[in-house]
Amino acid sequence: NYYIIIMDTNKIINADSIEHLKTLDENVFDSCVTDPPYHLQSIAERFTHSTEAKYGTDGSFQRLSKGFMGKEWDGGDIAFQKDFWQEVYRTLKPGAVLLAFAATRNYHRMAVAIEDAGFEIFDMINWIYGSGFPKRRNLLKPAHEPIVMARKGVNKDLNLDECRVGDEVFDTSKNVRKEAMNKKAVYQLGLKEDYKGTIVKGRWPANIIHSGLDTDWADFFYCAKANKKEKGDTEHPTVKPLDLMKYLVRLVTPENGLVLD
């Protein structure tokens, strides 16, 4: 059983991800930007004042020995299952890019499952922040979350010009050098070889997103963690900030494209 909520531009389907993905057509989505369960710790370890599930004690509301917020969706290892990512792969258009968040200590398990499902992993984005807290005295302070960058088959360009950082004016003639072997001009800002003017598009996007550390991070896209106002009424402790998600969607999705989460 499932139900659908239709908004102006979005549709929310409350259903089992694997089972419902099987009902969708092939080659539908232009990109996938998702924050799947991290499958980390038990509810007892993370939340000492946990209450009984609000709507019941069975099914997806059952308290499990593992699972973020005590929910089955985080107690399971769906993000590590090749079968799940194969369904995501099937519904994406050729050349579509997948961006998926993961925890630092089990990123590799999700990445392997994504690769085994048929995706080509071509990079990783690091979302870096300075507001994390170590869970125990013998652990490092958490300061980043990795994001898998994977592609379905065909190599299509990212929307890099739409995600440039800052608004500095660059004179391309100052960023040209001659290759010693073939004497071809190389423009270090990713510009066309015959372009000789100036632009106001900011710096070339990097595979790092930061949350405002006390240093010179002008070359990287800035995005702080979601604050209390942005979280709204939800009590979920790991809500991703809207600016971060908008940036990622813009990076990998064509104009008027359809995004799978």
Where are each of the predicted segments found?
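Core catalytic lobe of class I
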Residues: 2-260
